[in-house]
Amino acid sequence: MAAVAAGGLVGKGRDISLAALQRHDPYINRIVDVASQVALYTFGHRANEWEKTDVEGTLFVYTRSASPKHGFTIMNRLSMENRTEPITKDLDFQLQDPFLLYRNARLSIYGIWFYDKEECQRIAELMKNLTQYEQLKAHQGTGAGISPMILNSGEGKEVDILRMLIKAKDEYTKCKTCSEPKKITSSSAIYDNPNLIKPIPVKPSENQQQRIPQPNQTLDPEPQHLSLTALFGKQDKATCQETVEPPQTLHQQQQQQQEKLPIRQGVVRSLSYEEPRRHSPPIEKQLCPAIQKLMVRSADLHPLSELPENRPCENGSTHSAGEFFTGPVRPGSPHNIGTSRGVQNASRTQNLFEKLQSTPGAANKCDPSTPAPASSAALNRSRAPTSVTPQAPGKGLAQPPQAYFNGSLPPQAHGREQSTLPRQTLPISGNQTGSSGVISPQELLKKLQIVQQEQQLHASNRPALAAKFPVLSQSSGTGKPLESWINKTSSTEQQTPLFQVISPQRIPATAAPSLLTSPMVFAQPTSVPPKERESGLLPVGGQEPPAAATSLLLPIQSPEPSMITSSPLTKLQLQEALLYLIQNDDNFLNIIYEAYLFSMTQAAMKKSM
């Protein structure tokens, strides 16, 4: 009685399970076997390891009233997604306690873990028997010429569609990596078309001839699968051999893709009638010079681009020439304040000529908003030392140029290296050739060429970038060795012959243009023009000013007598200078207006007295 009751409970439980299964598949008619607790694992081809899925529950093996006749389902208790697999001839099972491994028609490998080993062995035996039955049935059906999938006319449509879908997907997954080219059918659109370019067939190599028949072997009407025994082997080598099959498929894909490449190259060659490899060497030759230029870019740069005048300015102002040298005295030091009035007048007049002659000239074409050159900054410092604070030697751009003026260089080497500084500013003050007024560019070019020839006679053995530094004249020097460089005339007149060394063709394009100088430069020249004429420091228009400077840092070496002559400004030149300054310098006009008001107040005071 107890056994009958137990059998009734089991039968009742199976009826409930069958009803639940029929909700998902109405063609299920009987449950063959049950495994109480299983878990599903999948094999990852990329990671070559097993991964646990979220499918876990009871496994049911059942029969169906439609094809496929058998199948199994894992009723998932973790989620609503169940695992259903039809048992067909394409399934391949292998038992490895407590796992039952199988591969389906989609070449996916799964492992079913059983809580009970007896259930694992029983279900594995049942699965193998059902698979063999399906294979035998399929073999007999194809031999007789009758499809075993159609049971009756009512169910034939659905069964045929399911079978066709499974078979089409199976063939697609097996043949998608085939490299065998498709055979062109004998169509009139292909053979009778005169505009069609037909590729010339290329004879494959021996290795390709051996590889090409291999895909043909897999294109059978009935695809044959590798067994899990060949995949996984025995139990002791199961985990190692499971990883063999997916890499083999990837390797076959790579081999088949490599087989495609020579054939495609031959077709391209026949279509383009050119060797593809002939295009590659010119590409390399085009790329190599660009890379070489990038590699040796610093060697191709012009040496003048590294000079301090060409470097970016800090705070929007160019540093004066004195900031690039290390010496005991600077242009803006308080020692410059005590110089004579005649020297100041000469420097102001010289700067006035620089402004007059740089404006109509063709050399100065830059934006006036750019920083002033070193000579103009030095004049501003020497004229109004109270308005400019001298900078420390370590500020700004002083550090890179200091490499030129170390103590290891000889005196002439110092002069050569320092000559590059004023030579950079030739487009700015190159018109200071000694003319007493505004001269034409043709006359300026002639004078520059004459000066260059004379300088080359005296310094023929010097490098191309080094200018000749004449020695200091006795008339402008004082008792101290560096007094000539400290004075305001030296910062202007010393650079005058240096700017005449290079011809306009060799002027670098990176030289900085000049700005309008400080109005303090023109504060007193308007009130004392006779003293400027009496100072005797203005050069004659047709003569070259003699050597009046030595190296900017070195003491006097061999003084020579001075040959400086002067000529006064004409009324027309003075008128042009005043008109230019009034029109272009607001500060100059303000100074004149202040002087006018001061004279008017003094005249009123004298009348009142």
Curated annotation (Swiss-Prot):
Instruction: Give the enzyme class.
Output: hydrolase
Where does the record locate the signal sequence feature? none
Cysteine pairs bridged by disulfides in the record: none
According to the record, the segments passing through the membrane are none
Residues with the modification Phosphoserine, per the entry, are 147, 272, 333, 440, 503
Q: Where can this protein be found?
A: Cytoplasm; Nucleus
Using the UniProt annotation, give all residue ranges assigned to the region (Disordered).
201-222, 243-264, 326-345, 359-438
The protein's Enzyme Commission number: 3.6.1.62
What is one GO cellular-component annotation here?
P-body
Membership in a protein family: Belongs to the DCP1 family.
Write the protein's name: mRNA-decapping enzyme 1B
Q: Which organism is it from?
A: Pongo abelii
Gene name on record?
Answer: DCP1B
